[in-house]
């Protein structure tokens, strides 16, 4: 159970990526001895999405948010804060025991239709996507390049309603 004098804050930062951005943010958290419970970052075409879930003492949370707002402004990024309840955090932690699967989608090129079909099957089976990662290099715009390969990895969690049916549906794509 979370002590009464601590707060859980989900920090979401978006905007143009640049070297030192994550260091600047975590330096502020370190200044107030915050504990980072989870962190994730994605960069798509130089656009950053950074999430940090931290625990801090209640008397520090306002100072942390104020300093992060000023730092975000000086870096030209957007920062948002979301309070997380103890119950929400505990429910999230308890999800780690669920089954985890890696699904890899491979082709010469991958269309929105193909990705939509895969993710629809996963959703219908009650699976949750934790992460999506491109495993191949950046795809050139020249579609005549026959050596191009595209590969995306989905990290999914949960127990499928019907694993065999899910596998059959995925193999038919």
Predicted features, each with a name:
Residues 1-173:
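A conserved regulatory-domain signal marking ACT and ACT-like small-molecule sensing domains
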């Amino acid at each position: 159970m979370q002590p009464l004098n601590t707060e859980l804050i989900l920090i979401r930062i978006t905007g143009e990526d640049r070297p030192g951005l994550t260091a600047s943010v975590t330096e502020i958290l370190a200044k107030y001895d915050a504990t980072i419970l989870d962190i994730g970052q994605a960069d798509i075409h130089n656009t950053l999405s950074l999430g940090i879930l931290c625990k801090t003492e209640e008397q520090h949370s306002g100072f942390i948010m104020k300093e992060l707002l000023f730092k975000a402004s000086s870096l030209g990024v957007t920062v948002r804060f979301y309070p997380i309840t103890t119950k929400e955090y505990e429910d999230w932690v308890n999800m780690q025991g669920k089954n985890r699967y890696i699904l890899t989608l491979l082709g010469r090129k991958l269309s929105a239709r193909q990705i939509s079909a895969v993710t629809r099957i996963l959703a219908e089976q009650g699976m949750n996507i934790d992460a999506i990662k491109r495993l191949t290099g950046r795809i050139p715009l020249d579609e005549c390049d026959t050596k191009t390969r595209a590969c995306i990895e989905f990290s999914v969690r949960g127990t499928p309603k019907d694993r065999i049916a899910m596998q059959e549906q995925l193999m038919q794509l």
